[in-house]
Amino acid sequence: MILDYRAFDTFGESCVLFIAAACVLVLLRDDQTDTTAKAIRDERFEPVSDTILQASAKILFPAIMIFGIYILLNGHLSPGGGFSGGAIMGAGVILHVNAFGYKKTQKFFNEKTYKIVTVGALSFYCVAKSYSFFTGANHIPSGIPLGNAGDIISSGLILPLNICVGLVVACTMYAFYTLFKKGGM
């Protein structure tokens, strides 16, 4: 029973994060049609080439992302989980943009990626948990094998739901950062 309520609570929190990011996107988005003015404005937000920061980020960015993924994947076995792992991964992407700039970061994380990942994660979470609304079912016997206790794949739907929460949190942190800093992703 506790898992049922926690899962719906977490889904609600993830939806609130997504709605907040969407509202910030609408309110702070800078929709200039003049491409020259936009290019000049975007150039202003590119970081100055800082050799020390870039060298540090080349080492730290992969380590931060791996640690975030580790926290995310082990959240059902140890302290951590989706929110913690997502916050760490979001901080890693923010480090990348500060070291290498928006142009390089947009090669792997742009507004389209943000929308696909967040909507996909929230949709999966909603579909995975919504059956209890219709059946009144308990979430623990979900039909997914629980595996051996202590293994990564040992918790039914908890691991995929942690991954969904982590993706939403990481994307939202980066979206807030870029929207507050320059008015767009």
What is each stretch, according to the model?
Residues 1-10, 148-163:
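Short aromatic-rich membrane-water interface segments that cap or initiate transmembrane helices
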Residues 1-26:
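Individual transmembrane alpha-helix segments
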Residues 16-25, 91-97, 161-175:
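Hydrophobic cores of alpha-helical transmembrane segments in multi-pass inner/ER membrane proteins
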Residues 41-60:
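Membrane-water interface at loop-to-transmembrane-helix junctions
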Residues 72-81:
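Membrane-interface helix caps and helix-loop-helix hairpins in membrane proteins
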Residues 80-91, 163:
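Structural signature of hydrophobic alpha-helical transmembrane segments
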Residues 98-113:
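Alpha-helical transmembrane segments
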Residues 111-143:
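A structural-propensity feature for long, helix-poor, extended segments
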